[in-house]
Amino acid sequence: MNLIDLILIAIYVIGISGLIFNKNNIINILIISELNLGTLGMLFVLASVELNDILGELSGLYILTFTAAESAIGLAIVVILYSKTGIINIRNLNKLKG
């Protein structure tokens, strides 16, 4: 394990602690999930380079695609939530019914 791996693991742990302690704002949750998935993708790519295997790089590409779709859907939900309630709070998601 080298220094870059340790830094990425530390960033991932910081992101998980951010999810645990900050559950009210949906924008912060989206940013933290992007951070976590980005670090996981980088860890997969670094592991594939160290092991000389292509599957880690493909997994990193899949994670990158998934995070792009997640952010697009999440931002669409945020826009709809703000237009309906005027507040971006996770507790107001039940007001988006039908």
UniProtKB/Swiss-Prot annotation:
Protein origin, superkingdom: Eukaryota
Keywords: Electron transport, Membrane, Mitochondrion, NAD, Respiratory chain, Translocase, Transmembrane, Transmembrane helix, Transport, Ubiquinone
Membrane topology per record: Multi-pass membrane protein
Catalysis: reaction(s): a ubiquinone + NADH + 5 H(+)(in) = a ubiquinol + NAD(+) + 4 H(+)(out)
GO molecular function terms attached to this record: NADH dehydrogenase (ubiquinone) activity
InterPro entries, sorted: NADH_UbQ_OxRdtase_chain4L/K, NUOK/Mnh_C1-like
Cellular component, GO, one term: mitochondrial membrane
Transmembrane segments: 1-21, 26-46, 61-81
EC identifiers of the protein: 7.1.1.2
GO biological process, one term: ATP synthesis coupled electron transport
Location in or out of the cell: Mitochondrion membrane
Similarity-based family: Belongs to the complex I subunit 4L family.
Function per UniProt: Core subunit of the mitochondrial membrane respiratory chain NADH dehydrogenase (Complex I) that is believed to belong to the minimal assembly required for catalysis. Complex I functions in the transfer of electrons from NADH to the respiratory chain. The immediate electron acceptor for the enzyme is believed to be ubiquinone.
Protein name: NADH-ubiquinone oxidoreductase chain 4L
Lineage: Eukaryota, Amoebozoa, Evosea, Eumycetozoa, Dictyostelia
